[in-house]
Amino acid sequence: MQDRNFDDIAEKFSRNIYGTTKGQLRQAILWQDLDRVLAEMGPQKLRVLDAGGGEGQTAIKMAERGHQVILCDLSAQMIDRAKQAAEAKGVSDNMQFIHCAAQDVASHLETPVDLILFHAVLEWVADPRSVLQTLWSVLRPGGVLSLMFYNAHGLLMHNMVAGNFDYVQAGMPKKKKRTLSPDYPRDPAQVYLWLEEAGWQIMGKTGVRVFHDYLREKHQQRDCYEALLELETRYCRQEPYITLGRYIHVTARKPQSKDKV
């Protein structure tokens, strides 16, 4: 079973993900967490791996802050878009681009990295535990993993709010092969277990878009964005709202004491 490659719909991906309030909100909440992680890691410049980094929006922002960023992606088109965006922002010297799948990145890295970004990729890979093991192997002891994944509970809630009862009863099968709907929505409890069994120490959990997608009046997503962001920020790091997020962002540390595997 192959992992998803976005070469065929790179433009649609960019427009639908980042050209909307859902993309803006996702980035806003994500960066609240990342700013906290960076503050905890101290003032030094970091080696950052953005695994499956797509067109590089998050990676470029890291590079703008002076960090050395390695971006890998399975899609050649996404790599090209990321390179162009990095050049436009003037951060190409702080970035390295590798055309490979996240699970193959270890052979391209000479030394471990300090921070790994793995955002909205886990729900597209057929063997998630293998990918997480690879990421563990390329992270230095004491380093941090920033993992954001598509939440199966959020998908179910979204469909129930929409009244898609038959679809939920049928187990929410994927309707088309080549769409932006993830292949493998993840159960958060399962993901947390995978991390803990592998030795990661979970530092924090955040629901991403815990209200936005459920609004009855969709125009409020745009017209009331600032108020919505304020309320998302207030509730997104407490239950039950974490588990209602369309995505969940987990930060986890690789312990100093455990040897690299």
Curated annotation (Swiss-Prot):
Q: What is the effect of changing residue 213 to A?
A: Lack of activity
The outcome of changing residue 124 to A is:
Lack of activity
- EC number(s) given by UniProt: 2.1.1.-
Q: What keywords is this UniProt entry annotated with?
A: Methyltransferase, S-adenosyl-L-methionine, Transferase, tRNA processing
Q: What is the effect of changing residue 26 to A?
A: Lack of activity
Q: Which Gene3D superfamilies match?
A: Vaccinia Virus protein VP39
Stimuli inducing this protein: Expression is positively regulated by H-NS.
Record's catalysed reaction(s): 5-carboxymethoxyuridine(34) in tRNA + S-adenosyl-L-methionine = 5-methoxycarbonylmethoxyuridine(34) in tRNA + S-adenosyl-L-homocysteine
UniProt keyword tRNA processing present: yes
- Residues bound to S-adenosyl-L-methionine are 26, 52-53, 73, 102-103, 119
Supply the InterPro entries for this chain. Answer: Cmo5U_methylTrfase, Methyltranfer_dom, SAM-dependent_MTases_sf
Q: GO molecular function, one example?
A: methyltransferase activity
Coiled-coil portions: none
Look up the record and give one Gene Ontology term from the biological process aspect. Answer: tRNA wobble uridine modification
Q: Per the record, what is the consequence of mutating residue 209 to A? A: Lack of activity
Record's keyword annotation contains NADP = no
What HAMAP family does its record include?
tRNA_methyltr_CmoM (MF_02057)
Record's function text: Catalyzes the methylation of 5-carboxymethoxyuridine (cmo5U) to form 5-methoxycarbonylmethoxyuridine (mcmo5U) at position 34 in tRNAs. Four tRNAs (tRNA(Ala1), tRNA(Ser1), tRNA(Pro3) and tRNA(Thr4)) are fully modified with mcmo5U in stationary-phase E.coli. Also present at low frequency in tRNA(Leu3) and tRNA(Val1).
Q: Which family does it belong to?
A: Belongs to the class I-like SAM-binding methyltransferase superfamily. CmoM family.
User: Which PANTHER family does this chain map to?
Assistant: TRANS-ACONITATE 2-METHYLTRANSFERASE-RELATED (PTHR43861)
Q: What is this protein called?
A: tRNA 5-carboxymethoxyuridine methyltransferase
Q: Which species is the source of this protein? A: Escherichia coli (strain K12)
